[in-house]
């Protein structure tokens, strides 16, 4: 799932470029491909709201705002940068490909936008204090540098981390909402300093920092959760309520960590499940990622280890709504990709008639002269698709392709990895820097290739933080002439 992009080694000379493709139903693609924008921090997850900080330290939001999740205090459903002539272009096609002709960007969307506003919305928050932003379905969390957590949006299942007064709260479709960024007082009252936040569809986790270990990784001292617990996705022993409106210690997760004498390496969330990668190479799952596929599939209350991949080290993990992907480094061999979970859109990456598989299986990437000696560098899951980043600027993908988020293929579902077949204009001078996925959106981030010979082969991916000037560009495909797309 998506997240924040920042770069600890900011350079005004180096330009970072974003190329994006996919579903533009709520204006997300348009703003990412607006060439006039200079974004230095971008926040996006598997839902339909986006946030960005520009070079002037202004914080903006755009996308779906039906529950005030954009934190702008307005009740407009959609916010993104466009004008009258552009608005006519956004309602003309059944698929979403972004192309460029002359100086005009053409955007073809999945469905009609409805309400369109003239500019992205500014958020009244001191930008320098923001550490990260995490998005859920209709709500958003903000984490500040001093460890405070703020929330905004819908609160029907306790997503905001506090209770709302029914007499003063805003009501949308019968759901209590808060349109103002509000601090979660639980952490303040208990003097808990939060270092990371992660959202599922309607539940949340907050990790309390402890220190930095010898490998440079953060060791988290405490784990807290709140929100929807109908499917046991909070990792708590207590089972009094369906919904928890205040943070509670995820004691079942802590119990497992203490028993194994290990620490958290990374926590990811899907629509109704949570998944934890530990320092001792375990992958713990709880909740129920398969409920909609098999009503008899039981909820997982106490975290279970699902890592049965032997003689290897898990180096990365990512989660879509109902599937999980990991990179596994085997001793004296290359890194390999494994997937677990739902497969109704081919998101497991290998042909099978099963709609869900509760064990990890290997994904084979087609061997070609281009990738024969290349290793996988990164994986990133969208809601129902996965991107694979390799060396030499190569990208592969599999899963749902209904918005052309994997490539310009006729198939809406790709059950095995296919090469990304869009051409990036003038990419000879660019190095693929990072990949990001949102719900049905794929983003590639490039940086200018360094002139220093010693640095020319550097293609290191910084997963968590990029903080550079972002210029946004357009996409075209290898096999379809530009004028044919437009």
Question: What does each of the following model-derived ranges do?
Answer:
Residues 321, 378-402:
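Loop/turn-rich, solvent-exposed surfaces of beta-rich toroidal or solenoidal domains
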């Amino acid at each position: 799932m998506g997240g924040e992009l920042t770069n600890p080694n900011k350079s005004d000379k180096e330009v970072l470029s974003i190329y994006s493709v996919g579903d533009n139903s709520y204006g997300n693609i348009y703003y990412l491909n607006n060439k006039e924008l200079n974004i230095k921090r971008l926040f996006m997850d598997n839902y339909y709201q986006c946030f960005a900080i520009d070079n002037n330290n202004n914080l903006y939001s755009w996308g779906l705002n039906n529950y005030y999740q954009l934190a702008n205090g307005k009740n407009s459903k959609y916010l993104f940068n466009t004008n009258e002539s552009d608005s006519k272009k956004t309602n003309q096609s059944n698929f979403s490909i972004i192309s460029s002709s002359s100086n005009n960007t053409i955007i073809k969307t999945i469905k009609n936008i409805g309400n369109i506003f003239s500019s992205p919305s500014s958020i009244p928050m001191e930008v320098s204090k923001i550490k990260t932003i995490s998005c859920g379905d209709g709500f958003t969390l903000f984490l500040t540098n001093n460890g405070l957590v703020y929330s905004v949006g819908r609160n029907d299942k306790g997503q905001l981390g506090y209770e709302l007064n029914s007499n003063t709260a805003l009501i949308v479709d019968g759901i209590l909402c808060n349109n103002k960024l509000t601090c979660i007082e639980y952490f303040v009252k208990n003097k808990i300093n939060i270092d990371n936040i992660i959202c599922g569809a309607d539940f949340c986790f907050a990790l309390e920092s402890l220190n930095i270990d010898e490998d440079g990784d953060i060791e988290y001292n405490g784990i807290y959760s709140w929100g929807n617990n109908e499917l046991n996705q909070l990792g708590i022993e207590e089972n009094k309520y369906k919904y928890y409106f205040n943070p509670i210690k995820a004691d079942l997760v802590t119990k497992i960590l203490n028993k194994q004498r290990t620490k958290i390496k990374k926590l990811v969330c899907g629509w109704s499940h949570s998944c934890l990668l530990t320092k001792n190479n375990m992958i713990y799952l709880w909740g129920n990622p398969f409920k909609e596929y098999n009503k008899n599939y039981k909820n997982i209350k106490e975290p279970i280890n699902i890592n049965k991949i032997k003689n290897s080290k898990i180096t990365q993990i990512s989660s879509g709504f109902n599937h999980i992907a990991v990179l596994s480094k085997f001793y004296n061999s290359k890194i390999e990709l494994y997937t677990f979970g739902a497969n109704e859109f081919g998101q497991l990456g290998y042909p099978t008639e099963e709609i869900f598989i509760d064990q990890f299986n290997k994904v084979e990437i087609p061997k070609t002269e281009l990738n024969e000696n290349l290793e996988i560098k990164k994986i990133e899951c969208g809601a129902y698709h996965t991107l694979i980043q390799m060396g030499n600027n190569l990208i592969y993908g599999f899963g749902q392709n209904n918005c052309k988020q994997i490539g310009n293929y006729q198939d809406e579902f790709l059950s095995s990895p296919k090469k990304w077949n869009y051409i990036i204009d003038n990419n000879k001078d660019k190095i693929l820097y990072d990949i990001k996925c949102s719900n049905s959106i794929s983003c590639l981030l490039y940086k200018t290739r360094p002139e220093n010979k010693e640095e020319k082969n550097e293609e290191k991916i910084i997963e968590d933080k990029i903080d550079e000037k972002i210029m946004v560009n357009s996409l075209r495909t290898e096999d379809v002439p530009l004028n044919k797309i437009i």
